[in-house]
Amino acid sequence: MQYKTFLVIFMAYLLVTHEAEAIWSFLIKAATKLLPSLFGGGKKDSSKRKRDVEDFFDPYQRDLDLELERLLSQLQ
């Protein structure tokens, strides 16, 4: 009975504190590693999405780099 009371108090503490984010993210990350079939296709999809995002923002980053270099050269 004391174990259940402690568990309820601990879970309530995690719900109301900001420090709980790290614990919840760890638990979710561990669950996704243990049960990948429940949480999606796995790393292939995430690597494709990451590559798509990098390709999407890459031209803008190049333009920004060129613009920053131009402004820095004007300051010198």
Curated annotation (Swiss-Prot):
Q: Where is the signal peptide?
A: 1-22
Q: What is known about the tissue distribution of this protein?
A: Expressed by the venom gland.
In its keyword annotation, does this UniProt entry include Ligase? no
Q: Which residues form the propeptide?
A: 47-76
Its keywords, alphabetically, are: Amidation, Antibiotic, Antimicrobial, Cytolysis, Fungicide, Membrane, Secreted, Signal, Target cell membrane, Target membrane
Give a yes or no for keyword Signal in this entry: yes
Q: Where in the cell is it found?
A: Secreted; Target cell membrane
Q: Which domain of life is it from?
A: Eukaryota
- What family is this? Belongs to the non-disulfide-bridged peptide (NDBP) superfamily. Medium-length antimicrobial peptide (group 3) family.
Domain comment text? Amphipathic and cationic peptide with an alpha-helical structure in membrane-mimicking environment.
Function of this protein? Peptide that shows antimicrobial activity, moderate cytolysis on eukaryote cells and interference with DNA synthesis. Has potent activity against Gram-positive bacteria and moderate activity against Gram-negative bacteria, as well as moderate activity against fungi. Acts by inducing bacterial membrane disruption. Uses multiple modes of action depending on the membrane lipid composition. Uses a toroidal pore mechanism against the prokaryotic like membrane and forms hexagonal phase non-lamellar structures in eukaryotic-like membrane.
Q: What is this protein called?
A: Antimicrobial peptide Smp24
Lineage of the source organism?
Eukaryota, Metazoa, Ecdysozoa, Arthropoda, Chelicerata
